[in-house]
């Protein structure tokens, strides 16, 4: 972090001003107009004691600066660290920086406290909740994003307490997932996934499609589908060091000062919006394959089913996954543990963004949120048939990587494979890679030789995080019980499955699989895994098509578990963004530690952030431009959310103003009343620099309510009212019937979607009526109700009304057949005659 004098060379011209002097002047009045505070500005020029009012009054402070020019620029607070109120670092921060606030244990809640502290020390996420409060809005219960925003504000407030009690968030997470109810110890990784999935669900925004990008995506899909005979090498980066793969797995707006408050000298990270849109199409909703030939067998959703007993498990974010059968693939004999035995208890993983099965024609809507922007990456999984060489591809979105901890035999096999591949690929991947490969080979050989001289029972196998990554991405043979069902061969074949990273996330969450749960017992793998504090390089694991330029990561936080598989305690080590020091967060106790303590920790979950010196220089340049008085005739509005990305992302991507614009270029009517929370005003020079550097847009010089959206909203409200009123009227008439001749059945799954739409809980109308899950079609073609089906009963008029609007089917009618009533004596006589006739 740059020193203050390095940031501004004009500080030498400032006179000696004490804190008491400033407090006294803040209680005074403007020397020109006599107005009182709080918006007063004191001139810090040596020998000048002037105090003037700010721009909310007559702005005499600016007039004074113009009359008595000095080499110092009157910046309106450009802090260089995370803050809740835009103030620069104070003397108090030098003693105890913000963010060093503990959390009280609310009964075995250390798993939650450790996870929240780790997330709190992820600057991209924390800055969003501190600076972009206007986007933290939701109508969905339990509004966990509001609870989290409040918690982050308390943790990073300048008047922070020694510890806080996260009771609101604690109760909210219990409402979402029954797994966390009660006071038993839970898995911190399960909590992280549940929390981030819910935050995404509450904060998600639909992605506005663009025709040009859609055409490009379709062309890319077509190219992917033409890879029928592609080999593994076609998908590997030339920087790879070995066999890679495996695929499991309008109102008032902000002022210039607001813009300056958001431009900070922090280490920032990011990703391209165009790339993000492209990957979302391939990974959101159903994790559909990227080619028409891609197999459904390879489309695995590890977040929805019990985790297979294999080494290559990847948590696919539920935002982009849908339930499918899993191809259980066993990789090594010493299989690493599952993170939790309760994988099937995830009730929160089903998302509205998913395309519902059963012939539904509902248009596919893709979503994004701050969670997906920061934590989502994508992996290209490939399965190759060894008979016909057909390659099936799948692009999967991941929120975290669950890595195996390889055993001694696995390490030997892994290193042997890597060394062989290094020798083979050194001549084909360029001189720089060859030199790097041989140097790594020699150093690794020496290290392994030294370790081999010491008894393994004393030293144990040396395992690095890179070893775990290599084990995760190692090729997996599909044979025996795990043979591959090839669509081209139409039978089971031997195959190979491998995967590569297609897009790297801004913050990489890595989960080490330390816990293994069997039917009769559970145990914990206590092997030490060494991990780098800086410079984690993922380039060897990238696909050639990878869109991420920055591939190195620095450690932000690490969560550790002390104890056994059945009991224990969670703590976290986090690096403070203000002073760069490492701290141990143990519930309500926060202690500074040396980085060697962190390196020797038994890591369970690690958070890495993209590192980029170029991004820091870009922010320095923008700060300098913002401080200059030269400005054009135009002022530009820019998304506060994108500006936060620029401040905290390594790759912020093109400028995107879609957070406050509609598809027609105006302000959506529902956002206009808080538009000042969504935008920041930029001077022309700053906008031109950012636009020339990053592209994107669109440029916005005037804010207005979109009249087209207003008409659409009114028409939608009218449609909803008409449909729900008509349904209530028809249903009342149906309830009044004593013996209806026919009753129609309707799928409750579809009905719940329609109900959510007409009650304005869902913005999109449902697709056609889908009764396929409750209908049973016999060989004769007759359709009847499936036994135990989830259905509702409606009248014929109601069915016809909904059918005329939405279409669909099939029709399932239950007809009442009433036998003709006959007199008992007459019937008895007929039966007697019939019996006598038979006897005769």
From Swiss-Prot:
Feature: compositional bias, Low complexity: 333-342
Segments for region (Disordered): 205-254, 315-342
Catalysed reactions, as listed in the record: Thiol-dependent hydrolysis of ester, thioester, amide, peptide and isopeptide bonds formed by the C-terminal Gly of ubiquitin (a 76-residue protein attached to proteins as an intracellular targeting signal)
Name of the gene encoding the protein in the UniProt record: usp20
Notes on the domains: The UBP-type zinc finger binds 3 zinc ions. However, it does not bind ubiquitin, probably because the conserved Arg in position 55 is replaced by a Glu residue.
EC annotation from Swiss-Prot or TrEMBL: 3.4.19.12
Protein name: Ubiquitin carboxyl-terminal hydrolase 20
UniProt-listed GO biological process terms: endocytosis; nervous system development; protein deubiquitination; protein K48-linked deubiquitination; protein K63-linked deubiquitination; proteolysis; regulation of G protein-coupled receptor signaling pathway
Keywords of this entry: Cytoplasm, Cytoskeleton, Endocytosis, Hydrolase, Metal-binding, Protease, Repeat, Thiol protease, Ubl conjugation pathway, Zinc, Zinc-finger
Domain of life: Eukaryota
InterPro entries given in the database record: DUSP-like_sf (IPR035927), Papain-like_cys_pep_sf (IPR038765), Pept_C19_DUSP (IPR006615), Peptidase_C19_UCH (IPR001394), Ub_carboxyl-term_hydrolase (IPR050185), USP_CS (IPR018200), USP_dom (IPR028889), Znf_RING/FYVE/PHD (IPR013083)
Basic and acidic residues compositional bias, start-end: 220-230
First-level EC class: hydrolase
Higher taxonomy: Eukaryota, Metazoa, Chordata, Craniata, Vertebrata
Molecular function (Gene Ontology), one example: zinc ion binding
